[in-house]
Amino acid sequence: MNVFIGGAWPYANGSLHLGHIASLLPGDILARYFRLKGEKVLYVSGSDCHGTPIALRAKREGESPRIIAERYHQEFKKTFTKLGFSYDNYTKTDNPFHHQVVQSIIKKLFEKGYIYKKQTKQLYCSKCQQFLPDRYVEGICPVCGKVVRGDQCDYCSSLIEPTDLEEKRCKICGSSPVIKNTEHFYLALSEFSDELKRLLDNNRGWRDNAIKLSTRYIEEGLQDRAITRDLNWGVSIPFEGYEEKRIYVWIDAVLGYLSASKEWSRHTGEPWQNFWSEDTKTYYVHGKDNIPFHTLILPALLRGAGIKQIPEKIVSSEYLTIEGKKLSTSRNWAVWLPDMLKNYQPDSIRYFLIINGPEKKDSNFSWEEFIHSHNGELLGAYGNFVNRTLVFIEKYYNGLIPDGKLNEKIKEKIETLYHRVGNKIEKTNLKNALEVIFNFVREANKYFDSEEPWITVKEDKGTCKDTIYTCVQIIANLTNLLSPFLPFSSKKVRGFLNIDKPDWKYIEVLPATKLEKVEILFPRINKNLIKEEREKLGVN
């Protein structure tokens, strides 16, 4: 089976924060899991280097957009690597090959009549002497009345035209813009209404928020969307006479999944088409603000271009708040990953964002809960079980796994876990999958306690060997089951047990296997850091 996983492309206009990672992490877990099963996986993403957020930052800093985008692209790559993201290709939109792929799709759609030119009205700032694309404008949402940018409302999820905003103002100078005529290229999205409705009706793996929002758009009637902007930064429209126009960043970005796949193919020699056919298992992983671009825009572009892949699974996470408040990068109300990774283990971050993440509803990050989950679950449950078992072997068996008899009921339980957890992962019920594993970890600790090996090692040596041998097999299989979620600590424990690589099936470590140097898996985090971290944020 071929499995394609596309992770949303973060804007390269600032550092990655926990909100980004909360929505993107499911992609890495899926990729690691399917590889363990032996499936062929292509997992791609990249930095979105175009669009108004980067152009605006560049203007503020007096730099070129390319310098800003490249700075954060390089930082993103380092951050994702430190967090254990296992992309097969992490690329960027500021890439000549990507430009070629996007332009070729645009030409094909234009030739087929799915893209057309149209005179339209657009906001123009007389003071700045330029047209104002979407994010260059701020105003009142005509649907819900909140202050929003000119392309999309994050409050009611409406797609907006800048001219529809009330109390409009230019984000560069603050003045009120006027309306001028201009010409743009449009995607005939309305032509795909019936096909997109069928796609929605036949979905079997979209999250509820994706189904509800996409249904709303289709029932309200799909509107043709402008696919160009008056900018000097981005992918050029491939037609003469329109040199000042660039392709809308979200058309550009979602076609990045295709260009990243083709780029991967060029580097590896593997055919990209294997992951873009109708029978490919696909997962698109992103936040709920990106839903319409993945459930409506992307399928329309692919269908129009004659590409048969469909978004089978839409993994659209809800929002993450920080200490009970909405995350805001402009107010620096965020937890930035480059800073967090200096002080905390990547597996601690990964664990928290799955077990407490915004999988199906908004969730909250607090420093108190984060440190509690590390000390209570990773250290207190999992780390404790691994440490107490392996230290016992070092103390009483000279570091050699004893020749004991495996508890058959526990073996059956482990074998069942592979199927049960795998099924939940494939359905993207990741929180529940991890809960099931940690429930088993707690059962393993109870088993150790009830068997009392510290007593039987003196009074019933055979029973003690059976207990410890069984505990070793529990640990060995936990390294497999937890590998998609906690890759760093799983690798470390495999090193303790001399296990070569993970697998998604029951394994046993042989008696007399020599333990490598056993270390503490998760050091305790000082609770005083809760206050320090909250003060850094500015929490009273």
UniProtKB/Swiss-Prot annotation:
Amino acids binding Zn(2+): 141, 144, 153, 156
Subcellular location: Cytoplasm
Alphabetized InterPro entries for the sequence: aa-tRNA-synth_I_CS, Anticodon_Met, Met-tRNA_ligase_1, Met-tRNA_synth, Methionyl/Leucyl_tRNA_Synth, MetRS_core, MetRS_Zn, Rossmann-like_a/b/a_fold
GO function term, MF aspect, one: ATP binding
Ranges spanned by the short sequence motif 'HIGH' region, renumbered to the chain: 10-20
Cofactor note: Binds 1 zinc ion per subunit.
Catalysed transformations (reactions): tRNA(Met) + L-methionine + ATP = L-methionyl-tRNA(Met) + AMP + diphosphate
Motif 'KMSKS' region, residue numbers: 326-330
Binding site for ATP: 329
Enzyme superclass (EC): ligase
Cofactor entry: Zn(2+)
GO cellular component: a single term: cytosol
Function in brief: Is required not only for elongation of protein synthesis but also for the initiation of all mRNA translation through initiator tRNA(fMet) aminoacylation.
Protein name listed in UniProt: Methionine--tRNA ligase
Upper lineage: Bacteria, Bacillati, Bacillota, Clostridia, Halanaerobiales
